[in-house]
């Protein structure tokens, strides 16, 4: 549990252990029942080791953000992101539901043919600014500038960066749809995360947000490349905020909101459209002039 990232990634074992790490805590109740059945004080004492280990590793991440979140400032920005699932035909539905939830900026991934145009048409009155690259796009109430596509080591474009310019300050936004990760095939995903971390590290903007489907959990060793330079806020109500699959129940957090230089007053998962991913939604205090 504590050293899963040190296990060599042979035959995909590293990837599997990394992503299963939070669930290893489920062994503790089973072990507790066995210890109680045996009436062994030694067994109960030994059980403290995995219990305390799990709490040490994951305890800080499950504390509700609402316990310590900064107060919303005079000017905030609500940002939502979702992998809308290609082939559902519900990209515009997702976008409209996220808009109705009060989002100022909406980032979507896994856009397929024609879906970006349908989203733009659905949102054009309230979100006149947009930038789309390949399968990812951003729609904003605020002007966008310095927008560019990002290949991130691949031969096709699944990421972008843009600057969101508000009256109360600007922020640099990165949107990514990382390549899929399977036990025997996650090289492209790993390379995209390395390249994204490099782009973020060299970006001089003080205020930054990276969102999207990273196809990596927070315990994935490849995700550490980016999570060590950007911060992921806890969930409003605590726990680990699993986003996939949406049904029958979520088991992994593949979709993230990562920030630098900005206060996050809220961070939640929301349902939208027909996707198999929950959307992620964060509210940020704008930096001011």
List each model region and its residues:
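N-terminal, active-site-proximal structural segment of metallo-dependent hydrolase catalytic domains
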Residues: 1-121, 288
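Soluble catalytic domains of enzymes that build or remodel membrane lipids, polysaccharides, and related
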Residues: 75, 79, 85-99, 110-289
């Amino acid at each position: 549990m504590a050293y899963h990232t040190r296990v060599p990634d042979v035959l995909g074992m590293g990837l599997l252990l990394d992503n299963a790490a939070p669930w290893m805590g489920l062994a503790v109740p089973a072990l507790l029942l066995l210890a109680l059945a045996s009436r062994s004080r030694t067994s109960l004492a030994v059980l403290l080791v995995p219990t305390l280990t799990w709490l040490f590793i994951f305890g800080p991440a499950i504390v509700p953000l609402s316990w310590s979140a900064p107060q919303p400032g005079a000017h905030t920005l609500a940002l939502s992101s979702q992998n809308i699932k290609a082939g559902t035909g519900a990209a515009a539905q997702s976008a409209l539901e996220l808009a109705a939830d009060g989002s100022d900026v909406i980032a979507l991934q896994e856009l397929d043919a024609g879906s970006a145009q349908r989203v733009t048409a659905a949102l054009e009155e309230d979100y006149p600014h947009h930038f789309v690259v390949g399968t990812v796009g951003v729609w904003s109430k605020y002007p966008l500038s310095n927008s560019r596509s990002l290949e991130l080591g691949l031969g096709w474009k699944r990421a972008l960066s843009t600057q969101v310019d508000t009256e109360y300050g600007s922020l640099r936004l990165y949107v990514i749809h990382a390549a899929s990760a399977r036990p025997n095939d996650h090289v492209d995903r790993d390379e995209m995360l390395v390249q994204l971390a490099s782009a973020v590290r060299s970006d001089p903007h003080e205020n930054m947000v990276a969102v999207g489907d990273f196809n990596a959990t927070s315990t994935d060793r490849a995700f550490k490349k980016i999570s060590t330079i950007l911060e992921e806020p806890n969930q409003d109500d605590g726990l680990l905020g699993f986003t996939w699959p949406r049904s029958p129940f979520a088991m992994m957090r593949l979709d993230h909101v990562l920030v630098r230089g900005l206060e996050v007053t809220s961070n939640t998962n929301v349902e939208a459209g027909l996707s198999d991913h929950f959307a992620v939604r964060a509210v940020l205090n704008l930096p001011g002039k």
